[in-house]
């Protein structure tokens, strides 16, 4: 039970997600609770903004395009979401064809076509969709900058995971694999709706696809917040070590540090201050996506920026 009286609903899932992203196996309870409250606020803000977009369109229902519009400035995240939706559709088709093994060849061909056309989801606000005639696509545009940016971010996470799992025992890797399956929405749709107050913030009940997308974006928020908090902690530790107040460098950074060593081998968990500083940094608006006010003056309403 928290200080505000709200019971944590995703403590275990958040611990598992933070663990695979670089945190120690057992984060501090107050840190986990803070992360849950922050991401809950982010999901609620996402629902509010998506509902406003739907009302502007004259609709009461949130669509997939509304959620895409909210993250349109993060091109790498947009492409990861497109990939997620493409493979989600493939898995759905695979379940439908389980009873007919003769269609396996067609399924593989569909998987290949889905992979090639995962970025073909039409977004009305994109320039290429503003022409009456479709822009012809060639091989030169198959791997654009957005796809390369998405691939780079994915490779960085895979590289970190490879380094952390390289010296694991079988039991440790089994635990790691179980943590990688953590989800906010898989078989937890009802809990997720209650957790973020979906029935209060939306006019109609969003379908399961919207809930799955929100679950994917919620994991992305946890990943971004955890990675930024670890960067803050690393910087603070280096400043402390360089000033001599934190002891020798070797004491805080042992050469042979296992993933499961925890506090006994010098690995310390994230503190609340690290998460708060990371959230503060992530709330600084990107100047490239900020409109000029032309010095008209007046009060500027503060808002929560989506991570």
Curated annotation (Swiss-Prot):
Main location, first listed in the record: nucleus
GO molecular function: protein heterodimerization activity; transcription coactivator activity; transcription coregulator activity
Location of the protein in the cell: Nucleus
GO biological process: regulation of transcription by RNA polymerase II; transcription initiation-coupled chromatin remodeling
CDD domains listed in its UniProt record: HFD_SPT3
Function: Component of the transcription coactivator SAGA complex. SAGA acts as a general cofactor required for essentially all RNA polymerase II transcription. At the promoters, SAGA is required for transcription pre-initiation complex (PIC) recruitment. It influences RNA polymerase II transcriptional activity through different activities such as TBP interaction (via core/TAF module) and promoter selectivity, interaction with transcription activators (via Tra1/SPT module), and chromatin modification through histone acetylation (via HAT module) and deubiquitination (via DUB module).
Protein name (database record): SAGA complex subunit Spt3
Organism of provenance: Schizosaccharomyces pombe (strain 972 / ATCC 24843)
Gene behind the chain: spt3
